[in-house]
Every structure is written in structure tokens, then in C-alpha cells.
Amino acid sequence: MPGKPSSFASLHDVELCSYAAAGEGRAFGELARRHGSAVRYLLRRMGAQAAEADDVAQDAFLTAFQRIAEFRGEGTFAAWVKRIAARQYLRRLQRERRLTELAAESAEDEEVVGGDADHRIDLDEAMKVLSKVERLCVSLCFGAGLSHSEAAEALNLPLGTVKSHVKRGLEKLRTRLAPADGAVLEGRRGNG
């Protein structure tokens, strides 16, 4: 690898990963600076409080730094670190035994909240109408780019259950975010 650049800000993520794998901490610092808010935003969407999102994001970047040599560049660094963060957050939930409570809450939260075209809200507000399990499933499949199978494995739920939560969550979001003219919103899943 050629000499170290004076500034890492102009380098592509793949180049930064190479420098970081060679032990250059400043290169990884630039990666964390670039992608830290997106990771925290994903965690907030998954239901983490601000301080908890900060803690999990910090842990995820520490894990990514320790495992940077494992990053093969098959996807983006951003997607890789988001998957690490999502999995760490889910493990945290499991440790606190919240997943059992989430499944019970899901049954109670079956009512669909309709959207009033005059009072349309943004996606963050719309996500609040989802049950916690729906929010987790939608966030993992669309925010972190996991497949339904990967989300099912991460949540330790049957594949069909995850698909149902995603479908129901998307229906609620479409209803809540429906444009005034009644046009249908199209959803797109992330990579994975």
C-alpha cells in the first residue's frame, strides 16, 4: 500500500477499509464519522432510545474495527456496519428478554391506524404506529437490508411470522403515508 494520505476525507470507503485493515486508526475514524449518524438513525427506527442507539452504534463500530479484515467489499461498508449494529441491538433485546414481551404486544397492537390526508406525517412518526415487532421486522428488512430469512434468523422467529409482520407493517405505513390524491406508495427493500 502506498504511503498514508494526509487526509482520509477524500478517499472512498473501500480504500479507507484497506488502510484501517492495515492498522490505520484515522482511516477507520473517517468511516465512523461518515456512517455513524446513519447507523444511529437505523437503531432509532428499530426502537432504541437515543442513548441506547449511541451505545449500540459505538459497540458496532468497535466490532467493525476489530473485524475490518473480514470485510470483503461484496457490499457497502455502510450496509455491513448497519447489519452489525442491528444484530447487536437484537442481541441486547434478547438479553433483556424483551422479545417475549414484543410478541405479546404485537397481538394487542393489531388495529390499523388510518392516515388523515390533511395530517400527513413523516416516516419517523409513521413508524410509531407499528407494533415493536413490526417496526423491528420492517427496519431490518428495509433499513438494514436484510432478507426476510436473515431477519427471521436474527429475531429467532419463523420466516412466515417475519413476512406477516413486514406485510402488516408496510400496509400500516402505506395507509399512514398515503398521499392526498390516493396514489399508491411503492416500497423497496434494501440490499440483501
Go through each PLM region and give its residues.
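Helix-turn-helix DNA-binding module
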Residues: 128-136, 140, 144-161, 172
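Amphipathic, Lys/Arg- and hydrophobic-enriched alpha-helical face
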Residues: 30-50, 67, 127, 176-179
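Sigma70-family region 2
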Residues: 21-22, 47-48, 58-76, 95-96, ...
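C-terminal edge and immediately downstream basic/flexible tail or linker adjoining helix-turn-helix-like DNA-binding
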Residues: 2-7, 153-154, 170-192
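Arg/Lys-rich amphipathic alpha helix in sigma70-family domain 2
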Residues: 66-73, 83-103, 179
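Short, charged helix-capping/linker segments at alpha-helix termini
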Residues: 2-7, 21-30, 40-59
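Internal acidic/polar
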Residues: 5, 9-13, 91, 97-125, ...
